[in-house]
Amino acid sequence: MQQGDQTVLSLRPGGGRGNRLFGSSSSSSSLSFGSLSSSDLPLLRPHGGAPASSFPFKGGDSRFDGRERVKYTREQLLELKETTQLSDEILRVQRETAAELFGEEGTWARGESVVSNLVPVQSASRFSEPDSRDWRSRSTQPPPSGEERSWDNLREAKDSRYVEASQYNRQDQPNSQFSRANISSNQGGGPAPVLVKAEVPWSARRGNLSENDRVLKTVKGILNKLTPEKYDLLKGQLIESGITSADILKGVITLIFDKAVLEPTFCPMYAKLCSDINDQLPTFPPAEPGDKEITFKRVLLNICQEAFEGASQLREELRQMSAPDQEAERNDKEKLLKLKTLGNIRLIGELLKQKMVPEKIVHHIVQELLGADEKVCPAEENVEAICHFFKTIGKQLDGNVKSKRINDVYFKRLQALSKNPQLELRLRFMVQNIIDMRSNGWVPRREEMKARTITEIHTEAEKNLGLRPGATANMRRGMVSSGGPVSPGPVYPGGRPGAGGLMPGMPGTRRMPGMPGVDNDNWEVPRTRSMSRRDGPGPLHSPAVSKSASMNTRLLPQGSSGIMSGKTSALLQGSGSVSRPVTVSAERPAQSVAPLTVPVPVEKPQPSGPKLSEEVLQRKTKSLLEEYFNVRLLGEALQCVEELGLPSYHPEFVKEAISLSLEKSPPVVEPIATLLEYLLSKKVVAPKDLETGFLLYGAMLDDIGIDLPKAPNNFGEIVGKLILAGGVDFKLVREIIGKMEDDRFQKMVVDAAVRIVESSEQGKSLLASQAADIEACRNL
């Protein structure tokens, strides 16, 4: 090599210049880029990428133009390798390049020797050695043809090689982990982070449960499915779940107790379950010699006792949580504690009914709740608990002569508490309600909600709606009559959805204007001009065959076929009156039928049947009022009341009408006052009937006002409207408030009546003429 020659030494294979990757573009270079054919390119491109024309190489470097190149053979380069010490920076760049070309896993498996000899060794081996590999056994697909090569294909091939290398390295896990640690530390420039283990690492417990856990898991699943309908089936499964030791027994009882106290409505069912299990499970030996045997009953009572006695301590702990940031947590825990306490009280009462708890324990609980000192007012939570306790077991205790005498002592104390000003007004009303309940033979004013089977629910629905027995079962099966099935699905009024969700003719059903009518055999009757304004298909005179109104009404409420057969009343078919024959038409659009005269059968007058019972009258009253509240048609309501056919029942009707209207949410004061005015003007209801009905309702207002605080005010408004109508006067108001004991309710009734009367010009003169009676009302 001469000094004068301006040559550039290059260590690149082929003596390339500048920033050329594979060689120069000179034609004299044996390994230059221009001298390679397209078939040779894949040997220098392991990934089988695009042809050379697609690579954005620069044509050359102007700094070395016109200078002679020095070419080195493979042997010369290998000699240079043995005597040359590469810096760490160059080695790092080589590793990164190899990782890009062959994948990281391939780099980790090959080691540094492969990286350092990457280009020369690979090219030499591919040129000198024949390809004897078994290409058919390859797991990955061969690279696509030149037309199909793309970056997506390259990425997929790289990913497949990465997965293959990972599977290979997993066979030697320690070496693989070691090599990964080295590579990551070298690439990142520092030691790999230490793996932090969790204190309680996750572990798959499925299939590794102990016998106790398996039984408790089974019992918990059974309790979650337990309902009155499935009680017998699931009770047997629970008994046979594998309760074979005392520890399992205690766990099962704890699950039942926790479930019962959080679901007080189902406490009767859980108490019965405890009684049945206690009778069928065996006893277990004690943990220590000399102790009593472990039985279901003993363990259950111990759990109930611990929960009852520990409630006070838990309340004290909650009172100490006074920090502002603990307020939300304290409120949640107080609600949960109250729910569990009342649920425990309810469960103990139901266990008494099943004879699982002796009466002496019940008396001990009552005495603990009331306290030993009669001059000290018990805690509010204790007063509420004692009310719930007597509501559950009061009738049971009064059934025993000895317990009844003790009950008298308890209720004297409760009588004093009902007037104790230290007690919250809500709790005083609650205590008074229990006292009234006892005086009424332990019959609650309102039916208590309890768990029922589906059959019981259907029976009650049939009773309330006046359906024949078994009708709701047919509805569920999609049957509208005993003779023919219909397509499955809900039964809609008029055979279409969106009409209130009730059956045709049921109280509350109202057809929209313009809807075609439907008769009782589910024939659709197109609306014509001759139909009634009230959307009821009246007598029609159309060129069609008429059919009588003797239709299938067995599944409709008693008296509800009026809407379907042209009658507008909900009581026409069940009140004993003679039904009028009505004809409806079924037009056939495809045929033209000449007018026909069909004789209408005339029913013979039947002798009036026996008088309806009070229960039937109340049911019919409720039905017609519900229908009136929905459709607000005074004429229909008038016809319904007339068809009751019992004027002596009219005072009771007035009372029921007021009661039902004020129990609505919101109360329907204006509609019921309008109805009573209308009945009075039509002389269907006499003024004496109104007075008696008002007095009957006023006598109950003290009790009603506890549950409906606005009832006295709303009742006063109804009375005021009837005073303006001339049906009653303020002398009646004086009699009404004379039957009331609560002075606050008395004032609300008088003020509301006066306010309504003085709102009109006519009322001002009435107030002046009855000023003495008004003053007497205010002085009561």
UniProtKB/Swiss-Prot annotation:
Keyword set, alphabetical order: Initiation factor, Protein biosynthesis, Translation regulation
Chain ranges of the MI domain: 616-738
InterPro entries: ARM-type_fold (IPR016024), Initiation_fac_eIF4g_MI (IPR003891), MIF4G-like_typ-3 (IPR003890)
Gene disruption: observed consequences: Displays resistance to potyvirus (PPV or LMV) infection. I4g1/i4g2 double mutants show reduced germination rates, slow growth rates, moderate chlorosis, late flowering, impaired fertility and reduced long term seed viability. They also exhibit altered responses to dehydration, salinity, and heat stress. The i4g1 and i4g2 double mutant has reduced amounts of chlorophyll a and b.
Classification via PROSITE patterns: MI
Feature: compositional bias, Polar residues: 166-186
Similarity field: Belongs to the eukaryotic initiation factor 4G family.
Role according to the record: Plays a role in the accumulation of some potyvirus during viral infection.
Assembly with partners or alone: EIF4F is a multi-subunit complex, the composition of which varies with external and internal environmental conditions. It is composed of at least EIF4A, EIF4E and EIF4G. In higher plants two isoforms of EIF4F have been identified, named isoform EIF4F and isoform EIF(iso)4F. Isoform EIF4F has subunits p220 and p26, whereas isoform EIF(iso)4F has subunits p82 and p28.
The protein's name: Eukaryotic translation initiation factor isoform 4G-1
Source species taxonomy: Eukaryota, Viridiplantae, Streptophyta, Embryophyta, Tracheophyta
